[in-house]
Amino acid sequence: MGPLSRDAWAQRLGAFRASPSAFMAGPEGEDLGRDLLSDLRSEKLSEQTKVSLLALSMEYPAQLWPDASAAEVAATSLLDTLVLLPPRPSALRRPLLLAATTALAAGGALGPTSGASCRLLPLLLGLAAGSDLGRGFVPASEQRPLQATACECLRELESCKPGLLGGSLGLLRGLLGQEGPVQPLSLLLALALRNTLVLQSRVGAGLGGLLTDKVSPTGGGPWDWTLVEEGDGRLQPQAPSWPAAEEGEGERSLTAREHSPEEARELRAAVIQLLDTSYLLTPVAQAQLLWLLGWALRGLQGQPPALFKPQLVRLLGTAQLTLLHAMLALKAAFGEALFTAQDEALLLRRLTLAAQHPALPPPTHLFYLHCVLSFPENWPLGPEGEEAAPLLLGPQLCRGLLPSLLHDPMALLARLHLLCLLCAEEEEEEKGQLPSPRHYLEELLAGLRQRAALDGGPRALATLCFQASYLVACCLAGQPTVLTPLIHGLAQLYQARPMLAPHFVDLLDQVDSELREPLKVVLRQVVVSRPGRDEALCWHLQMLAKVADGDAQSATLNFLQAAAAHCTNWDLQQGLLRVCRALLRAGVRGGLVDLLQVLARQLEDPDGRDHARLYYILLAHLAAPKLGVALGPSLAAPALASSLVAENQGFVAALMVQEAPALVRLSLGSHRVKGPLPVLKLQPEALEPIYSLELRFRVEGQLYAPLEAVHVPCLCPGRPARPLLLPLQPRCPAPARLDVHALYTTSTGLTCHAHLPPLFVNFADLFLPFPQPPEGAGLGFFEELWDSCLPEGAESRVWCPLGPQGLEGLVSRHLEPFVVVAQPPTSYCVAIHLPPDSKLLLRLEAALADGVPVALRTDDWAVLPLAGDYLRGLAAAV
Amino acid sequence: MFSAGAESLLHQAREIQDEELKKFCSRICKLLQAEDLGPDTLDSLQRLFLIISATKYSRRLEKTCVDLLQATLGLPACPEQLQVLCAAILREMSPSDSLSLAWDHTQNSRQLSLVASVLLAQGDRNEEVRAVGQGVLRALESRQPEGPSLRHLLPVMAKVVVLSPGTLQEDQATLLSKRLVDWLRYASLQQGLPHSGGFFSTPRARQPGPVTEVDGAVATDFFTVLSSGHRFTDDQWLNVQAFSMLRAWLLHSGPEGPGTLDTDDRSEQEGSTLSVISATSSAGRLLPPRERLREVAFEYCQRLIEQSNRRALRKGDSDLQKACLVEAVLVLDVLCRQDPSFLYRSLSCLKALHGRVRGDPASVRVLLPLAHFFLSHGEAAAVDSEAVYQHLFTRIPVEQFHSPMLAFEFIQFCRDNLHLFSGHLSTLRLSFPNLFKFLAWNSPPLTSEFVALLPALVDAGTALEMLHALLDLPCLTAVLDLQLRSAPAASERPLWDTSLRAPSCLEAFRDPQFQGLFQYLLRPKASGATERLAPLHQLLQPMAGCARVAQCAQAVPTLLQAFFSAVTQVADGSLINQLALLLLGRSDSLYPAPGYAAGVHSVLSSQFLALCTLKPSLVVELARDLLEFLGSVNGLCSRASLVTSVVWAIGEYLSVTYDRRCTVEQINKFFEALEALLFEVTQCRPSAALPRCPPQVVTVLMTTLTKLASRSQDLIPRASLLLSKMRTLAHSPATSSTHSEEGAEAIRTRATELLTLLKMPSVAQFVLTPSTEVCSPRYHRDANTALPLALRTVSRLVEREAGLMPG
């Protein structure tokens, strides 16, 4: 494919810039790099186009040449293009140099094995030195710009591979003295010096003659890569910042070796040389230089920081932010060695006053506040990393820096941070005449919350409030006097505006447990205390899913129960189930099972119902550890419980039937006289919920046929149970005692066995009536029975004392069902059937004042004394 | 119904704030306190009445105001108009605790009747009804010289009788009956005198002539409601009022009322000779008062029927004729019920009446009481009244569906007489398409009536057709509208939405190509066949904005609920299958009225589940159709609720526990179909044109797939893969545009849970196919049945650290 036209390239570059990765993934992507390189040599394209092509290659080297080999090829090609340029002024030389450098650096191809590197480095060094490379390579007019560019390129390469220029230090130092671009050279030298110092001291070597050796390394054959290999590329801070990361290691290694006086003198001379010319540099470059030198010299023995003193005089009055920052960096590095207390006070005053300047743009304002907040002190107190306000920053100074609701959010937060630091210090200070910072802080937070609670207020206000709360929680985590009102204030905020729930959830996720746990409790109370239909139900549920745990179960469950009725759509139902899930994971059982069952039956949406049922079944059937596994992978898998084999007291207990105190009471109900057999009516009553109750009865003395056991599925205290009917099959008509045993399961799953107090079957309990004779035939029927008794039976007369109720009352009370013939109030004929096949006939006649004579007959002798006792006892019986 | 002006007045009245009303009341109070009974007061009271009656029950007046109103009502000097207003306001405010109207102090009977009306509106809390009744009776008994008093009191009496039937004692009732006889039968036949106009009235006032019939002829027989004249005397007024209360009184003093003794007496007198001859000849004899009243009432009704034959000169009179006919037939019905001897005397005349009326569309409302008469007495009279019903059910709805009054009466007639229809229920059932016309046109007032009527109409034979008809009800409304619009101008145009013009629809209505479909929709009787009306839905789309159609569409979900609760009582297995199929099939062919589809879908989905609960094997039997339904993915998102239900039912009931015929192949087939559906649902890019797929469809699909996998374990790896894909998908930002954050989280949670469950296949199988008793309330409580308790005990045994239960 021939070279593309200018327009074609413009189109292509436009497409590329719109979405580089998409373009590279597309069909044209492969050829782009190749075409670009080849077209750089094309005659048809103007220089302008070529410059734009080169700009592209500088901006997107990683996309164009993704691996080292491609980068190598590209750099070689670029260098060839450079060499082939005709010896006349051209705008392409500098871009070409830069592009080649970029390709090598970004592609990771820089190294001793790379041909391109070995060509580029000497070329750059030569150009930087301003020496003529022959063949009219550089037109005179381009000499200086190229020199500067070469320096930039070298600096780039040096910062990629620290130590690369270690051998050229002398040469560079020499150049600085001569005519030439000061700024690039100064920066390059400072960087190389810094890197060399650090690397040399790490390996324990001195500078040697590096600073004085003015011979170009290119002259003596291949490039010297030894320092680079030692450095191993680990020394790569890219931006001027507090050199905290490297500090520990750097300091140790820097002090490891002392320089010889010779070396020290040379070094000092070099540094002074650099500093002396530094005023010529732009402020940013100056800051960079100071930072590099500061780091290079920090902790280096024999190199007093007093070297910087002359510069400080200039710097203390600077209005340039970068220079101010550089100075603070020097202060952080050298502390009291360089700065007196007066300096420090002056700096602080400058900072605080500058931070209050009304006309400052917000970023500058924030910068000053940041400087105040992390002010490097001469004598840092307290452990590393602990935040504290600067010591010399008195309350007087701070007064102007207190936050107010009118500040813009970032400034407010920064000032709030300072305020928090002041509050943290406040404890040891006595109460001043000024309102205490803590009080101020509380008012401010309350104001923020008030603004956040405004209905329909912008979200930014709420966000600010939560940011401030978070900040306070972080800074003052250990202070309950601050946290308690904060928590309550937040709870009120939630109450006022539940739609902030997502913010709360976020805050809970972020803060430490010192705030989180109490805040959770309070929020849960707020949510749970307002059950029922609410616009904010979805927020409440979202909140509850976050804060619900094992505590205050019943209130939470009640809330959910009330909410369930209003969860009509799927989203709300899912919210509800999310809360249930949180409870499940917190290990709540009890009422939750009931709730889930209700949900599984009542929710409207089939999916919600199904999901509730799934939770219900899981909760009902799985033991806690397994439930944890089933609900989510985050809980650790339980260790397999292998105690089946272990001897275990409880294990035995659970499998055995245990003797227990009786939890059931039985009472005899009223007598029942229907049916062919006498039936006892028993009224059971439980003291605790019991299940599968089996009552076994044993008759003493074989008087009755063996009795069936009675089963009751479930008995609960306070719930009336149905009476139990126990039919008796007497073998002879006699009272008896029944032994009662109960066997049941408790609600905890144990099987128990208990002796109940014995039951007494009375003589009267066995009475059964004869079938009712037809109307009017009663007397004849009775006479027939009366007569049938005698030959083998017995007859007797008994005096039955009458109580206050008289004969009528007595009969109606005790003998009513058995009366065959009645002539009230004087005469009654009573016929009683006694199972299995005996009868007892009574004639009560002519009652006197205190008793009635009873004539009785029976066909069973044995009954006679029982009947006598019965009759005599009637009056006493109520 | 109201003119725009009246409408705006009502609006104003309703929007008056309490503050304003309070001020207004205090002004009225001032006026009343000053006993200013001039036009100002009149105007203010009129306004107050408007406000009070326009905002029913929500306004309360202050006690002082109420007291003043009462006082004004009691003022002897108060003009009548003010009194009427005061009474009306007090009636509107009832029941009121602070009422202290004294019944005894009022002298004027006019005033008495007003006070009585207020008292009777109180709801008989302090036995007011009885007191008022006795008071009126005293007035009646006192035989005051002449009637203005009675004229006002008789309506009060009528009301008392209805409100509290036991008020009157025997002799009082007899007295009233006697007087009713007098009033009914012996009103004068001369017109009343005009009011004497005072001093300046001309003495040359025309001599009052005799009363006339409606056609202008001089009255030949006794005076009735239908006699006309310029001015009525008081006894004529009483005649009219007596007729008004006649039916209520007859019912009150009927054989089952306090008058039982009388009938017994009479039957003893006449023995069992209930022959036609004896019945006709009994008129002249002296009868007990109640008997006499019946006799007179019968004569009165017959005279009315005869009078209604005459051609009325004025339109008002002709309306009156019809109304009186209705009442007369009803009275006759009551008479015949109380005393069968009237039956034979009235039959011939009623038959003639029916013959006369059936051809006259104007007097169609008379047909209903007539039909009721024949329905209740047809058997006794051995008359074949089939023709009456045929005419009633086939012709009337077709022609008169747009008359709101008739529609309401017609449906109430059906509802009230369901118990009488026993033999003719099939006629009623088969004519449901006709009844639905009433419903379609007048859906708001008739919905509740139909909910009560549907259980009787639903029948296994016509259930499917009826379901179709219910779903097409809004369409039917639209077609009825078209029918009316295209009909030649009727004398009285029914109300329709004049703002809506749909010429294309009208053309389509006349297009012979669609005649068949329109005829089908307008069929008078159930035809047994069903036709796809989808073309009509498209055609009639412009009518969907019509207010009537929208109202009808709102009523349909309620009716569907009622229909299903009725049909599930009679449905057998195959009908359930057919119903389920119909549900699925019709879900995407509904009339496009706004909001209609959503409402219907929610009912259909819950009913589909109800059908599945009734017959779980439905899922296996209809497997092919269900698969087909799930395959047609277009429009799935709009039917989300139905899809959710169907998918859930598949997961729940496609299992061997419910149907032994369920095979692994079937499960696999469903799994594949649902898997494809899930992919289709989640992979489609969000676009403005397509509705978003709700997250519950995704979650229910995932759950169902997991359930199926737990039953056919070969599918577990596939299901796991699918679930983990869904989980990552829910994390990706692409989904967040499709689902809300909560939705995405729900999907994620569900996928995670199901994934972990599938890792424990034994648990999954148990948990995802629970036995039916799981949902019984005692499941986890009862130690006898509770698997949970047993499991918990075992797990406690197995865990050492759980510290076993206390010994």
Curated annotation (Swiss-Prot), chain A:
It comes from the Eukaryota. Keywords: Protein transport, Transport. InterPro entries: AP5B1 (IPR038741), AP5B1_barrel (IPR048980), AP5B1_C (IPR048981), AP5B1_middle (IPR048979), AP5B1_N (IPR048978). One of its GO terms (biological process) is protein transport. The keyword Transport applies. Residues 234-260 are annotated as: Disordered. It holds the Pfam family AP5B1_C. Residues 250-260 have a biased composition (Basic and acidic residues). One of its GO terms (cellular component) is lysosomal membrane. Probably part of the adaptor protein complex 5 (AP-5), a tetramer composed of AP5B1, AP5M1, AP5S1 and AP5Z1. Interacts with ZFYVE26 and SPG11. As part of AP-5, a probable fifth adaptor protein complex it may be involved in endosomal transport. This is AP-5 complex subunit beta-1. It comes from Homo sapiens. The lineage of its organism: Eukaryota, Metazoa, Chordata, Craniata, Vertebrata.
From Swiss-Prot, chain B:
GO terms for cellular component: AP-5 adaptor complex; AP-type membrane coat adaptor complex; cytoplasm; late endosome; lysosome; nuclear speck; nucleoplasm; nucleus. The keyword Protein transport applies. It is found in: Cytoplasm; Nucleus. InterPro entries: AP5Z1 (IPR028222), AP5Z1_ARM (IPR055450), ARM-like (IPR011989), TPR_AP5Z1_C (IPR056856), TPR_AP5Z1_N (IPR056857). It comes from the Eukaryota. One of its GO terms (biological process) is gene expression. Keywords: Cytoplasm, DNA damage, DNA repair, Hereditary spastic paraplegia, Neurodegeneration, Nucleus, Protein transport, Transport. The keyword Membrane does not apply. As part of AP-5, a probable fifth adaptor protein complex it may be involved in endosomal transport. According to PubMed:20613862 it is a putative helicase required for efficient homologous recombination DNA double-strand break repair. Probably part of the adaptor protein complex 5 (AP-5) a tetramer composed of AP5B1, AP5M1, AP5S1 and AP5Z1. Interacts with ZFYVE26 and SPG11. It is linked to Spastic paraplegia 48, autosomal recessive: A form of spastic paraplegia, a neurodegenerative disorder characterized by a slow, gradual, progressive weakness and spasticity of the lower limbs. Rate of progression and the severity of symptoms are quite variable. Initial symptoms may include difficulty with balance, weakness and stiffness in the legs, muscle spasms, and dragging the toes when walking. In some forms of the disorder, bladder symptoms (such as incontinence) may appear, or the weakness and stiffness may spread to other parts of the body. This is AP-5 complex subunit zeta-1. It comes from Homo sapiens (Human).
